[in-house]
C-alpha cells in the first residue's frame, strides 16, 4: 500500500491534479474515471471501454468508464465517475483503486461537459461488464497516444481539431477521449507528442517556446472546457 500511495503522489504532481472536483455547470455534466495501471513494466496503461452497439448514442465508440450526472450524485462529479465505473465495469473505489484527483473539465462537441477523475489501480480487479452499456474493455499503454504512427486529425466546423488513433492492436480511439489520453500521456511520460496538439499549439510552438509538460497540459486545460465558437482555432 505504501508503494501505491508513493506512486500516486508522483502521478498527482505530474498531472497537476486538483483535490477538489470540478463543479457542475448546471447543464449537461458527465463524470469519467481515468483508471491507470502501473504494472512495473515501465508502460503505464489506461483503461478504455468500447460502448455497447445496442446504445442509441455513440454505439461502438471508445470511451472511459463514466456517464451523465444523476440527482443521487449531489452535484459531485467525482461521485458520478465512481458510481458509473462501478456500474459499467465493476471496479470499486475502496478495493480496486485509489483516487488521485481531478483534471479540469473537457467539453465534448455537443455541449456535454466531461469531468475526469484520475485513479491508480491498487490490484488487478475482477471486471464485471454491464452488457447493455459496455461491449469490451482494454488496457492500452499511454505512450501510444504520443506517437504519430497511427495518428491523424480532422476539423469540425473548420476550427476544432479532432485527434484520431487507428491502432492495429487496439480499437480506434478519437475525439475528446483521445485528447484526454494525450494530455495524461504528456504529463505522466514527460514527452511531447509527435504531432500538432491544437490549432494554436503546434510542434513548432512547443519546441520553439521550450514548453515543458506541465506548461503544455495547462495550455490544453485553458481551452478544453470552452464552448464551441468557431472564432479561434483550438
From Swiss-Prot:
UniProt-listed PROSITE patterns: NUDIX
Activity dependence on pH, as recorded: Optimum pH is 9.5.
EC number(s) given by UniProt: 3.6.1.-
Disulfides per UniProt: none
Membrane topology, as annotated: Single-pass membrane protein
Motif Microbody targeting signal location, chain numbering: 232-234
One GO-annotated biological process of the protein: coenzyme A catabolic process
Segments passing through the bilayer: 170-190
EC top class named in words: hydrolase
Cofactor(s) needed for function: Mg(2+); Mn(2+)
A GO term for molecular function: succinyl-CoA hydrolase activity
PANTHER family in the record: NUDIX HYDROLASE, PEROXISOMAL COENZYME A DIPHOSPHATASE NUDT7
Function: Coenzyme A diphosphatase which mediates the cleavage of CoA into 3',5'-ADP and 4'-phosphopantetheine.
Protein name: Peroxisomal coenzyme A diphosphatase ndx-8
Organism expressing this protein natively: Caenorhabditis elegans
Amino acid at each position: 500500500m505504501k508503494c501505491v500511495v508513493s506512486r500516486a503522489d508522483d502521478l498527482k504532481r505530474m498531472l497537476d491534479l486538483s483535490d477538489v472536483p470540478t463543479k457542475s455547470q448546471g447543464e449537461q455534466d458527465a463524470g469519467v474515471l481515468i483508471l491507470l495501471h502501473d504494472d512495473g513494466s515501465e508502460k503505464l496503461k489506461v483503461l478504455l471501454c468500447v460502448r455497447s452497439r445496442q446504445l442509441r448514442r455513440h454505439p461502438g465508440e471508445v470511451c472511459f468508464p463514466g456517464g451523465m450526472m444523476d440527482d443521487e450524485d449531489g452535484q459531485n462529479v467525482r461521485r458520478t465517475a465512481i458510481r458509473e465505473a462501478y456500474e459499467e465495469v465493476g471496479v470499486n473505489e475502496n478495493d480496486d483503486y485509489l483516487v488521485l484527483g481531478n483534471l479540469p473539465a473537457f467539453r465534448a462537441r455537443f455541449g456535454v461537459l466531461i469531468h475526469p477523475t484520475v485513479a491508480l489501480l491498487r490490484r488487478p480487479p475482477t471486471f464485471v461488464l454491464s452488457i447493455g452499456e459496455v461491449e469490451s474493455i482494454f488496457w492500452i499503454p499511454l505512450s501510444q497516444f504520443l506517437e504519430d504512427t497511427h495518428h491523424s486529425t480532422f476539423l469540425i466546423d473548420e476550427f476544432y481539431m479532432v485527434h484520431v488513433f487507428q491502432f492495429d492492436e487496439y480499437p480506434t480511439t478519437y475525439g475528446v477521449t483521445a485528447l484526454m489520453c494525450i494530455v495524461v500521456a504528456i504529463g505522466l511520460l514527460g514527452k511531447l507528442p509527435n504531432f500538432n496538439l491544437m490549432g494554436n499549439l503546434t510542434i513548432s510552438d512547443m519546441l520553439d517556446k521550450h514548453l515543458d509538460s506541465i506548461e503544455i497540459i495547462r495550455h490544453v486545460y485553458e481551452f478544453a472546457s470552452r464552448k464551441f465558437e468557431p472564432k479561434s482555432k483550438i
